[in-house]
């Protein structure tokens, strides 16, 4: 495959055009008065969204050099989404502003390496300043405010606040589609843990990259499962029962895993294999907890329960299981209420009796998982398109609320970034030459999210940025009411984790593009067989 190569300014200029195309598509959605973007799908109806990462994922450009720039900025959105679950539009807008400011200076002769170093130092300083100035979030009202800002919907904010408060810090909040028009909250018995599927072939919902099993059977196994003859008799019984299967074991590998994958691809048996969390005695104890929740037994050769001989009676059940690459949630296990309450009482007694802080902490974690349950937010809407958009908004709101509980909140509406920029003057004075210039480029870029929030609200962005930079900390511009004031009191707040991720990821990608000297892409094939193409088309003409 032959390649095309571009150098220096030409390469960077083409990448900048790609960056602009992607960022310009995303930034119209920023802020409470942001607009929507309509995405045509190759199948089904169009999707209407204002979620930055959803838009970014859909964009691939025709020009391969421009596409390099677009894909690099897309990685800012996806990485911010993976870490914080929100803030993708802010990250994209920041990256664009840093890249544009940086490239202007590189074109004028600045050293890209020194410029990049200055940008990184400024990003780290802002990230630390944001964390230091964050307000912890503990009460339901603050959580609801964060979720409201993320979803632009007070009802969703209230539901997420209620859900997070009910299941506690260690509880699990999941989002499902409802068959009714209402969006409502259900608290169910259930448990979640931080281990995902062992193969991406188990995914059943490609949009969310999750494996979802409804009315599932659950096999809990204390040891590794690698031999197919051991697993096959049980798989045949499960296939006859016509139900999906969740396998949680120390590990699933070799023939056993490849058979499950082949069945998943052929859709002959819906099964998902997951590694049991923790190690040693903690893993054994957690599997026993899961057995109580699902109403099953742990297959354990030590007590005479051998995988080859077990029937369906040993398996647990669950109304719904959701597995992604990092986590598993079991909702409405088949265990009886008495058994679960008994297990909780036993754990409480062990906590009382324990004289080791470490053991007590681990027992409390297990109790929280059992007692917390799972909050399910069922999202309803009038049309399929509306439902998708609303479900996306609720998922973002849940991520934002979790991030807020983790690291606290800062003022929203782009004000925290503008005000953090004011603190960079000291850093700039400590640096010299192009590094100091990098800090300047970064400081100027920090106002871009606020600029676009104001512009999308129909105001002059530059005027609003100027005014906010003169306001005391905690004050800013509320684009929903078009007024200046105390943003925390108004509930215009962002999780600091989201804002920090946006800053750090944007700076990292901008630095990559600024220091690019050569771009290599594959040469498009069409030009080579143009002649054949025409002949082929001509031939078809005759066939008709």
UniProtKB/Swiss-Prot annotation:
Coiled coil: none annotated. PROSITE patterns: CHAPERONINS_CPN60. Residues 534-544 have a biased composition (Basic residues). Keywords: ATP-binding, Chaperone, Cytoplasm, Isomerase, Nucleotide-binding. SUPFAM superfamilies: GroEL apical domain-like, GroEL equatorial domain-like. ATP binds at residues 29-32, 86-90, 413, 478-480, 494. It catalyses: ATP + H2O + a folded polypeptide = ADP + phosphate + an unfolded polypeptide. Its EC number is 5.6.1.7. InterPro entries: Chaperonin_Cpn60_CS, Cpn60/GroEL, Cpn60/GroEL/TCP-1, GroEL-like_apical_dom_sf, GROEL-like_equatorial_sf, TCP-1-like_intermed_sf. GO terms for molecular function: ATP binding; ATP-dependent protein folding chaperone; isomerase activity; unfolded protein binding. It is an enzyme of class 5 (isomerase). Residues 519-544 are annotated as: Disordered. GO terms for biological process: protein refolding. It holds the Pfam family Cpn60_TCP1. HAMAP family: CH60 (MF_00600). NCBIfam families: GroEL (TIGR02348), PRK00013.1 (NF000592), PRK12849.1 (NF009487), PRK12850.1 (NF009488), PRK12851.1 (NF009489). Together with its co-chaperonin GroES, plays an essential role in assisting protein folding. The GroEL-GroES system forms a nano-cage that allows encapsulation of the non-native substrate proteins and provides a physical environment optimized to promote and accelerate protein folding. Forms a cylinder of 14 subunits composed of two heptameric rings stacked back-to-back. Interacts with the co-chaperonin GroES. Belongs to the chaperonin (HSP60) family. This is Chaperonin GroEL 1. It comes from Mycolicibacterium vanbaalenii (strain DSM 7251 / JCM 13017 / BCRC 16820 / KCTC 9966 / NRRL B-24157 / PYR-1). The lineage of its organism: Bacteria, Bacillati, Actinomycetota, Actinomycetes, Mycobacteriales. The gene is groEL1.
């Amino acid at each position: 495959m032959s390649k095309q190569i571009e150098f220096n300014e030409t390469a960077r200029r083409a990448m900048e055009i790609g960056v602009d195309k992607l960022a310009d598509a995303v930034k119209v959605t920023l802020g409470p008065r942001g607009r929507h973007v309509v995405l045509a799908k190759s199948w089904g109806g169009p999707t209407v969204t204002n979620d930055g990462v959803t838009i970014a994922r859909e964009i691939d450009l025709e020009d391969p050099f421009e596409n390099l720039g677009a894909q690099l900025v897309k990685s800012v959105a996806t990485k911010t989404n993976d870490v914080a679950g929100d803030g993708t539009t802010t990250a994209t807008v920041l990256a664009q502003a840093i890249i544009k400011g940086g490239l202007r200076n590189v074109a004028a002769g600045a050293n890209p390496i020194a410029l990049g170093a200055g940008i990184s130092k400024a990003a780290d300083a802002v990230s630390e300043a944001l964390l230091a100035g964050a307000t912890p979030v503990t009460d339901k009202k603050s959580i609801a405010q964060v979720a409201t800002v993320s979803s632009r919907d007070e009802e969703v904010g209230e539901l997420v606040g209620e859900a997070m408060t009910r299941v506690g810090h260690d509880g699990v909040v999941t989002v499902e589609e409802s068959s009714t028009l209402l969006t409502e909250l259900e608290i169910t018995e259930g448990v979640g843990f931080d281990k995902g599927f062992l193969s991406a072939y188990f995914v059943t919902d490609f949009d969310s990259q999750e494996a979802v099993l409804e009315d599932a059977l659950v096999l809990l196994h204390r040891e590794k499962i690698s031999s197919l003859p051991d697993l096959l008799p049980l798989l045949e019984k499960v296939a006859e029962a016509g139900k999906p299967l969740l396998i949680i074991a120390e590990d699933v590998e070799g023939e056993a895993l490849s058979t499950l994958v082949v069945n998943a691809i052929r859709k002959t048996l819906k099964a998902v294999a997951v590694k049991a969390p923790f190690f040693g005695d903690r893993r054994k104890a957690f599997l026993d907890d899961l057995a109580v929740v699902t109403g099953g037994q742990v297959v354990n050769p030590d007590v005479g329960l051998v995988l080859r001989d077990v029937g369906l009676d040993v398996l647990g059940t669950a109304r719904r299981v959701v597995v992604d690459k990092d986590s598993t949630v079991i909702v409405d296990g088949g265990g009886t209420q008495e058994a679960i309450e008994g297990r909780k009482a036993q754990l409480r007694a062990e906590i009382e009796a324990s004289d080791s802080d470490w053991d007590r902490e681990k027992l409390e974690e297990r109790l929280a998982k059992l007692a917390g349950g799972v909050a399910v937010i069922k999202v309803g809407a009038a049309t399929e398109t509306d439902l998708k958009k609303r479900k996306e908004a609720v998922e973002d709101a849940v991520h934002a609320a979790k991030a807020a509980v983790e690291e606290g909140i800062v003022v929203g509406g782009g004000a925290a970034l503008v005000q953090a920029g004011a603190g960079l003057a000291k850093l700039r004075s400590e640096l010299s030459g192009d590094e100091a210039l990098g800090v300047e480029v970064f400081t100027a870029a920090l106002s871009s999210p606020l600029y676009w929030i104001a512009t999308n609200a129909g105001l002059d962005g530059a005027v609003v940025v100027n005014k906010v930079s003169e306001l005391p900390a905690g004050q800013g511009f509320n684009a929903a009411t078009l007024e200046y004031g105390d943003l925390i009191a108004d509930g215009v707040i962002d999780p600091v984790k989201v804002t920090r991720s946006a800053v750090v990821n944007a700076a990292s990608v901008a630095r990559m593009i600024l220091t690019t000297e050569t771009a290599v892409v594959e040469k498009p094939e069409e030009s080579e067989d143009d002649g054949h193409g025409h002949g082929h088309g001509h031939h078809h003409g005759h066939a008709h």
